[in-house]
């Protein structure tokens, strides 16, 4: 949990135990996922980035090469080992979000075993030696068992909750539309027509932005 004001405008950037600050009036503990809906949007991003940095600092007290303590660099956002000169930069994991489309349909999924229950898009991390376009094809095949073509980059988004840089892609179904779920990852995978997609007011999620972009461009206007 992160300690923040009731208005979410003031964020304390260290993760703490609830009992330590239970006496502070005017504050309450909230889960970091609360920042998905926080406004203004730039404050929400600042809080999520603070959480990302906290995790990096927490996990990097000592040099992974020689074991000596790391120190903050004076000029860069970097940790430096004075002994062996090793430089440690914030961990940022590239990942893709994929909107698979078939004319007026889009492939929507739901995660298995997670608290987030809304529809989402296929997503996954890029492997070493892999282009992000290759990640798109691999993740789609692994999670829902279909092939894709015409992979097109949309936009990116930093996402500190998972320490990621998210890269959004649109692509088209290539062949058979039969879905074979990877049940360890997903509980639902289904084709949904643009007319059947609900408009959700979500100002921070790249996933929701991509779903809404597809819906608005393909919904019938009869």
Question: Which residues does each PLM region occupy?
Answer:
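Hydrophobic alpha-helical positions that pack around
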Residues: 122, 136, 140
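Short Cys/His-rich Zn2+-coordinating modules
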Residues: 40-50, 61-68
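Active-site-adjacent beta-strand/loop module that shapes the phosphate/pyrophosphate-binding cleft
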Residues: 157-179
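Short functional micro-motifs and their immediate structural scaffolds
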Residues: 68-71, 89
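N-terminal strand-loop-strand
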Residues: 61, 75-121, 125, 147-148, ...
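Single conserved hydrophobic/aromatic residue that forms the stacking wall/gate
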Residues: 1-12
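NUDIX/MutT-family hydrolases
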Residues: 20-39, 181-208
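Short, flexible, mixed-charge glycine/proline-rich loop motifs
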Residues: 50-59, 70-75
């Amino acid at each position: 949990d992160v300690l923040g004001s009731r208005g979410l405008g003031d964020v304390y950037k260290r993760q703490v135990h609830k009992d330590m600050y239970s006496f502070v009036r005017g504050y309450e503990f909230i889960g970091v996922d609360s920042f998905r809906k926080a406004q203004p949007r730039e404050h929400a991003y600042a809080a999520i980035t603070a959480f990302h940095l906290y995790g990096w600092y927490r996990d990097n007290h000592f040099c992974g090469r020689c074991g000596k303590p790391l120190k903050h660099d004076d000029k860069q956002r970097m940790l430096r080992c004075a002994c062996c000169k090793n430089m440690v930069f914030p961990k940022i994991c590239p990942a893709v979000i994929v909107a698979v489309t078939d004319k007026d349909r889009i492939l929507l999924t739901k995660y298995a075993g997670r608290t987030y229950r809304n529809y989402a898009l296929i997503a996954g991390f890029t492997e070493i030696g892999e282009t992000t376009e290759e990640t798109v094809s691999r993740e789609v095949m692994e999670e829902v068992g279909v092939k894709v073509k015409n992979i097109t980059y949309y936009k990116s988004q930093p996402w500190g909750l998972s320490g990621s840089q998210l890269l959004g892609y649109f692509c088209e179904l290539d062949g058979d539309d039969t879905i074979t779920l990877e049940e360890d990852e997903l509980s639902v995978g289904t084709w949904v027509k643009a007319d059947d997609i609900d408009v959700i007011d979500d100002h921070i999620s790249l996933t929701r932005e991509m779903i809404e972009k597809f819906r608005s461009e393909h919904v019938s206007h009869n």
